[in-house]
Amino acid sequence: MRYALLIASAIALLLSSTPILLADETVSIGGSNAVLLRPTAPRASVILMPGGDGYIAAGPGGTIGKLKGNQLVRTRNAYLARGLAVLVVGADVNLARAVDYMAAIKRPVTVVATSKGTLRVAHGIAGGAKPDTLVLTSGFLTDGSGSRQNVANILGSPRLLPRTLVVAHRYDSCRFTLPAGVEPFIRWAGGKASFKWLDGGTDSGDPCQARGHHGFNGLDSEVVSAAAGFH
């Protein structure tokens, strides 16, 4: 009898610590499709904004047709496994509406953007989006990153910037997201931003694509751990 009770207790503990997941679904945010993944009882929400042209080709039933190799797209289920409600958005989704949508599911809402997605999130925040926190990975941060198009220049001042985490690879060789842009961004943010350096992993192919250090190839768990824990 005692053994049976111990087994029952262990099963109950396992079930209570494992999030119950709903089926992936395609949802409309202001007329644009996005992909929603969520547990029945999320502890927080994340909005994932991939790089490149930003178009994920969200199809029926939560399918994603493009940018499947993008670091944020390929790790979306890892955020879900951590008990987070996850919204993967394309470039055509209005960020302010996306934040409001996820806030209705569970706050805090963290936007995680990578590469060119960091430009889109900056425009979204400048346009009125108000996430609780922000994570920028392989970001177009400052002029030191290698491009005049960057988060600091788009926002102009850190007044609208939420609490922010920068995740960067020490050896990112993409000419638009160079490591040299990180420390100037931290100074510009005036106490609103912190940073995490990663190194290691595998570097191959185009230095601005997902298989290089720019895309944290081989370091997905480290990126997810940092981003999912920042809220």
Model-assigned labels for residue ranges:
Residues 22-41:
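N-terminal cap/lid segment of alpha/beta-hydrolase-fold proteins
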Residues 112-121:
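Gly/Ala-rich beta-loop-alpha elbow adjacent to hydrolase catalytic centers
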Residues 139-200:
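The feature captures the conserved acid-bearing segment of alpha/beta-hydrolase catalytic domains
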Residues 40-78:
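Short, surface-exposed "cap/lid" segments of acyl-processing enzymes
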Residues 70-72, 88-106:
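Alpha/beta-hydrolase active-site loop
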Residues 8-17:
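Bacterial N-terminal signal peptides
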